[in-house]
Amino acid sequence: NTASIAAVGVAFGEYFGYFVSIPAGGVQMVAVISIILLTAINVAGVKSGVWTQNILTIVKVGMFGGVILLGVFLPGTESLNLLKNSGGASSLGAMGMALIAIMWTYDAWIEISYVAGEIKDPGRNIPKASLLSMVVIIAIYVLANGVFISALSIEKMAGSTLVASDAAEVYLGSAGASIIALAILICTLGANNANVLTSARITYAMAKEKLFFRSVAKVHPKTETPATALLIQGIWATILTFTGSFNQLITYMVFASWIFYGMSAGAVIILRHQKPDMERPYRVWGYPWVPAIFILFAAWLTVNTILEAPRDAAIGIGLILTGLPFYFFWSSRKGSNEAD
């Protein structure tokens, strides 16, 4: 998730460059400043982080709503063909790589579980919030992409780094492009604020389980936030900001994440067999077919990434492997303490 924070920070830097001329390496520096700012907001208190998130989410939904309305009331310059296929033997592999970015845009589906301990009636509210948010997000993304394609064509979209702004320019000229670029700039802050807010809870939970430094499990005496976990997360995200482009960073992140997502789905099946009587506040719908299909998809996505982007996959695997010695070290310490 720190790779995701770094990636969104880089995206913020790229859109910032739409308004201000940035020298070489400046995108990463802008990304670092945005990460520091959001980390400070979330250290200051949960309420400040949540209020920031609510405001930025309203702006984000409003921006996408505006883009969708452009497509409804103004004619596009391209014919809308959602079934267009370039063909070729490598189409399946290329589709898998395209899915990397798509799965990243939907990756927040899991992040609500990171703050489950701070949610009232999580057994009821988490599934409800997850389902509702996914339906809304899918509708917004599909409609917005239809507008983008009708304005730019798939080929032009593939060659653009500022798709929403370029689409707005087709409809409204340079003024419209600037407005959308500003809205996207705010949207990236909103997305990253959600990442910063939720992801630090993983490190915090690990420390509470005695799988990391105990000091990380402490909350700030005044703000009652996991300040140390937030600071560690911010430092690591800052370092990752300088390790690659936006596309490379999300490839590291999605590749590594889906290995664990697949393993988590496998754990559902294993636990159903090993502990059939265990209390389950939430039971997987469509068991065992839904987790089985999920596992197959996760396996295909990770294998395809290895074949199509071996360098990025190797870095993702390397990031996982660097964490294993620390995990085994803390696990052994936890076992020793419990034995004592």
Regions found by a protein language model. Name each.
Residues 1-35, 39-43, 184-205, 230, ...:
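Hydrophobic transmembrane alpha-helices that form the core helical bundles
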Residues 15, 36-43, 68-69, 145-147, ...:
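Alpha-helical transmembrane segments of multipass membrane proteins
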Residues 23-29, 55-182, 312:
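Helix-loop-helix junctions that connect adjacent transmembrane segments
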Residues 41-47, 76, 175-176, 212, ...:
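Transmembrane helix-loop junctions in multi-pass membrane proteins
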Residues 215-227, 261-312:
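C-terminal membrane-solvent junction of multi-pass transporters and transport-like membrane proteins
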Residues 251-252, 256-257, 286-340:
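A generic transmembrane alpha-helix motif of multi-pass inner-membrane proteins
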